[in-house]
Amino acid sequence: MCFPDGALAPRSPRAGTAGPDRALTLTAADGAVLMAHEARSASPAQVGVVVMPDVRGLHAYYRELAVRMAEVGWDAVAIDYFARTADTDDRSEGFDFMSHVQQGTPEGMALDVQAGVAHLRELGVERVFTLGFCMGGGFSWRQSAD
């Protein structure tokens, strides 16, 4: 874990105002329905980011981090990795993430990222990048080769 359970995502010193944010579900190409959190920039964004969390999945920290991205002018979607093995509910301190991490696959994770990228493109974003933490950092790096 990259931070304690109650940690807050940092604010940029140049942060503006974010547009709306909301919880949503995305459907991967294999039919898996994953939790996600969308945060929109207050102005039309040219850049979007898929936030790839640590091993805990879509923890509140990463939902808030998506909003921080929107505050600097990027549309963002934070995704959850556990659509194929866990319900779409809370990922706070009590979530047994390790049993789900062990069942995940790189192929499933790639499909989840593709769903996030497709969602941002539907919003009109032209350039998309990934930002990953812990396990998500390794998969973010891997996405750059695909």
Regions found by a protein language model. Give the residues of each.
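N-terminal cap/leader regions of alpha/beta-hydrolase-fold enzymes
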Residues: 1-146
